Amino acid sequence: MNNTEFSKIADITIAYITDTIEEQDKEASIDVDLQGDILNLDTDKGIYVINKQSAAKEIWLSSPVSGPCHFFYEQGKWKNRVGLELMAILTEELDIDFNNV
């Protein structure tokens, strides 16, 4: 994947995460703040940071629950080195259904 493709897919993914939270978080318990390539999610569990790392062609997640993790794009999914998917981790930790992507 070239840099342009990575950037487009990563931007779509971060926008999807943002939009999904805003649609499903009816109680507004998650404060969503997107600044450029960095998405901050302030929750009752702590602050999540999700950002794209163009040089590595990865999305990085810093979670107050599961810690830091890097995800690469493979077969239409963002996966970490042990095969866990970004959307599955976010679904479990935030109680928001991200599995429609």
Curated annotation (Swiss-Prot):
Keyword Iron annotated: yes
One GO BP: iron-sulfur cluster assembly
UniProt entry keywords in alphabetical sequence: Iron, Metal-binding
Gene3D superfamilies the record matches: Frataxin/CyaY
GO molecular function, one term: ferroxidase activity
Source organism superkingdom: Bacteria
SMART domains from the UniProt entry: Frataxin_Cyay (SM01219)
InterPro entries noted in UniProt: CyaY (IPR047584), Frataxin/CyaY (IPR002908), Frataxin/CyaY_sf (IPR036524), Frataxin_CS (IPR020895)
Pfam families per the UniProt record, alphabetical: Frataxin_Cyay (PF01491)
GO CC annotations on file: cytoplasm
UniProt family annotation: Belongs to the frataxin family.
Role: Involved in iron-sulfur (Fe-S) cluster assembly. May act as a regulator of Fe-S biogenesis.
Protein name: Iron-sulfur cluster assembly protein CyaY
Organism: Rickettsia akari (strain Hartford)
